[in-house]
Amino acid sequence: MAEITSAKAMARTVRVSPRKTRLVLDLIRGKKVADAIAILKFTPNKAARVIEKTLNSAIANAENNFGLEKANLVVSETFANEGPTMKRFRPRAKGSASPINKRTTHVTVVVAEK
């Protein structure tokens, strides 16, 4: 049987737009886990907080479930898919209204041994 060398964590229905989340994910993809955490700590973005929590969860999954060493882990795969959109309306002049889409994101972080 093949040995497991990767672990995954997901954050679902996060109240940040997928487009903004992808910008932060591009910063950490392919980096060592320690470097990725340092980058996220100093990124002034709402998405960075969520991604940092998800990354820490993936690291914990790797250590506890699969017995992998944190020092050997690399962020191998990250992606942000679109979650459900909350549709709202903003009242405008003359009794009309404009639609507002409050987008949500499903964030996935995969860490693997290098």
Swiss-Prot record:
| Pfam families referenced in this protein's UniProt entry, alphabetically | Ribosomal_L22
One of the record's GO cellular component terms: cytosolic large ribosomal subunit
* InterPro entries linked to this entry: Ribosomal_uL22 (IPR001063), Ribosomal_uL22_bac/chlpt-type (IPR005727), Ribosomal_uL22_bac/org-type (IPR047867), Ribosomal_uL22_CS (IPR018260), Ribosomal_uL22_sf (IPR036394)
**Alphabetic keyword roster:** Ribonucleoprotein, Ribosomal protein, RNA-binding, rRNA-binding
Q: Where does this protein have coiled-coil stretches?
A: none
Which GO molecular function annotations are given, in alphabetical order?
rRNA binding; structural constituent of ribosome
Give the top-rank taxon of the lineage listed in the UniProt record for this protein.
Bacteria
Example GO BP: translation
Q: What SUPFAM superfamilies would the database entry show?
A: Ribosomal protein L22 (SSF54843)
Q: Which family does it belong to?
A: Belongs to the universal ribosomal protein uL22 family.
Assembly: Part of the 50S ribosomal subunit.
Protein's name in the database: Large ribosomal subunit protein uL22
